[in-house]
From Swiss-Prot:
Belongs to the BRX1 family. This is Ribosome biogenesis protein BRX1 homolog. Required for biogenesis of the 60S ribosomal subunit. The lineage of its organism: Eukaryota, Metazoa, Ecdysozoa, Nematoda, Chromadorea. It comes from Caenorhabditis elegans. PANTHER family: RIBOSOME BIOGENESIS PROTEIN BRIX, RIBOSOME BIOGENESIS PROTEIN BRX1 HOMOLOG. GO terms for biological process: ribosomal large subunit assembly; rRNA processing. Keywords: Nucleus, Ribosome biogenesis. Residues 1-55 are annotated as: Disordered.
């Protein structure tokens, strides 16, 4: 029994020694794998940091746009603001601004958000929408009245552009003819143009922002998709019209550089429309009264009246029948008028 116990003890020692060797070898392999993984992981952040550093060096235009609206904005204005945020990768949003606050508060909010430009949609009476575009640092700021708003969801056009892609800004030749339009063109380029090498932008161009000048210096905005290499255009949306109200030297303040003489307030237009409606209603009432009167006259004339006297006044039909009797009556009347002439004696002349 002693020999077997010794053999068993030796086998246990050998198995324990082999187990220790296997564990040591596994530890070496795991350490080598960990070191290789750590080296790979170290290389990845290094590459990422190098890419970000290169892109940061190329990203020289650090324009950021603050897009927000006032309280009481209607649904169409909110959807338009959402579409603009989707089209501008360098845009930042904020909560609605109370209308009781001064517009100068927007400059402080833009500085807190590290934004250099502001697009503020101001709604009045839940009917009229005004768009403010401002350069926070030095000005200027422009106030527009927004007409004919149609959002992407409403239009459902066939065109489609990728999100966060860079647009081509296309301007009408009329922007170079007037000084106020030149300034508006510069503000639109700085506000709506996506900076090159922006971190959130895609490195390609697939749509066009078109700005054209219409009657009364109204600016028409359209967004078109560039279809493949054929360079055909398909409208994407949104679409709206901007009518300039005033142009200020500062950011939401300062001297008035230009006041649009063709601008008419929506309140004045609604007042004139109401006046026109009142005059129109009066005209319609007068026409109705005259029509009723004419209908009564025609109805009276159409009725057949009965002559109660009989044939006495029917002179046309009874003239032939009563001609003899009438002749006798007239003869008697004329006889009475004829006087008998008395015979007069001849006067004495003295010749006898």
């Amino acid at each position: 029994m002693g020999k077997f116990s010794k053999i068993k003890k030796v086998q246990e020692e050998e198995s324990a020694h082999q187990k220790m060797e296997w564990e040591a070898a596994g530890a070496k392999d795991s350490s080598s794998d960990d070191s290789s993984d750590e080296s790979d992981n170290d290389d990845q952040p290094k590459q990422a940091t190098e890419e970000t550093r290169k892109r940061a060096e190329l990203w020289t235009n650090r324009e950021r746009v603050l897009v927000l609206c006032s309280r009481g904005a209607d649904v169409r204005t909110r959807y338009l603001m959402k579409d603009i945020k989707d089209l501008l990768p360098h845009a930042k949003g904020d909560s609605k601004l109370d209308q009781q606050k001064s517009l100068n508060v927007l400059n402080e909010i833009a500085e807190m958000k590290n934004c250099t430009k502001v697009m503020y949609f101001e709604s009045r009476k839940r009917k009229d929408t005004y768009l403010w575009m401002s350069n926070v640092e030095k000005g200027p700021s422009i106030k527009f009245l927004v007409h004919n708003v149609h959002t992407m969801k409403e239009l459902k056009m066939s065109g489609n552009c990728l999100r966060a892609s860079r647009p081509v800004l296309s301007f009408d030749d009329a922007f170079d003819k007037k000084p106020q339009l030149k300034l508006i063109k510069a503000v639109l380029m700085q506000t709506l143009g996506t900076p090159h090498h922006h971190p959130r932008s895609q490195p390609f161009v697939d749509h066009v922002f078109n700005f054209s000048v219409g009657e009364g210096d109204k600016i028409w905005f359209r967004n078109f998709q560039i279809v493949d290499e054929s360079l055909q255009l398909q409208e994407v949306g949104p679409r709206f019209v901007l009518e300039m109200v005033r142009l200020f030297a500062g950011s939401f303040e300062g001297a008035v550089l230009y006041d649009n003489p063709n601008y008419v307030s929506p309140n004045v237009i609604r007042r004139e429309h109401r006046k026109g409606q009142h005059s129109y209603i009066e005209k319609q009432l007068a026409v109705k009264a005259s029509n009723i009167k004419q209908a009564k006259v025609t109805e009276i004339l159409a009725e057949k009246t009965v002559d109660l006297v009989g044939k006495e006044f029917d002179t046309q039909n009874n003239a032939a029948a009563d001609s003899e009797a009438a002749a006798q009556i007239t003869a008697q009347i004329e006889k009475r008028r004829v006087r008998k002439k008395k015979s007069q004696a001849s006067k004495y002349t003295g010749s006898d």
